[in-house]
Regions:
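Non-catalytic, usually N-terminal nucleic-acid engagement modules in DNA/RNA processing proteins
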Residues: 1-65
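Catalytic cores of enzyme domains
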Residues: 20, 27-28, 56, 60-220
Length: 220
């Protein structure tokens, strides 16, 4: 998967996922005989993406489709090479639960697989070497030894701890345009607690994706 563009990958323990996920949202809900969940992560957009305006960044700033392509190919490869039934885990929302409830938590898969840890920046997973990544998962009946979650959380970074000690805020808190982030750091410089106002974030970050609302504003 690295040759195809993945930066990191790991195997999540299916039984751990079943214990943590809400009822009906563990891997076995999608594939009853699943033995392993493979999680992989790809990097974000190019450096130039961050020099573009907000409207442009809304369309080119993420690379999750590359992660999905790699995962789809991996599922086919496992079936061809090992003869074990596999599926690309759909990243879509549950049509019976509305627009905010996914069929599976790709974030949880990655966290349990040890390729990301939750941060103060809106609970985004961070990797100590690759930072923020986009994730995809493969469910397979091939039994693989599971990896473990990260022992050390890369968040907060020492420089963030220093700023928090001086101002009471980490950089992500300070520069969030809608003040949707809050939290605290303990005496050892470790993440103590965090709060993320998802509604405030969505109102700002998805304004260029919510086409109906844009049209409504135009008609007003």
């Amino acid at each position: 998967v690295e040759k195809k563009g993945a930066l990191a990958f790991g195997v999540a323990d299916v039984e751990v996922l079943e214990k943590i996920a809400p009822d009906g949202y563990g891997p076995k809900a999608l594939m009853p005989r699943v033995k392993s969940v493979i999680s992989l992560g790809v990097g974000g957009g190019t450096k130039g993406s961050w020099a573009a305006n907000a409207k442009t960044l809304a369309y080119i700033g993420d690379t999750e489709t590359m992660a999905y392509r790699i995962a789809y190919g991996l599922a086919f490869m496992i079936e061809k090479k090992f003869g074990a039934r596999s599926i690309f885990c759909p990243p879509d929302m549950d049509p019976e639960k509305g627009a905010r409830t996914p069929l599976q938590s790709l974030k949880l898969h990655a966290e349990v697989a040890g390729i990301g840890a939750r941060s103060m920046a809106g609970d985004i997973l961070l990797h100590p070497e690759f930072g923020m990544m986009y994730y995809a998962s493969v469910f397979t009946e091939l039994e693989l030894p599971p990896d473990s979650p990260m022992e050390e959380n890369p968040c907060p970074h020492p420089s963030c701890v220093k700023l928090h000690a001086q101002t009471g805020q980490t950089p992500c808190m300070k520069f969030c345009p809608v003040d949707c982030l809050s939290g605290s750091v303990d005496e050892e410089g470790k993440l103590k607690e965090m709060h993320y106002d998802a509604h405030a974030c969505a109102a700002m970050s998805q304004q260029y994706e919510a086409i109906p609302n844009i049209l409504l504003d135009m008609m007003d």
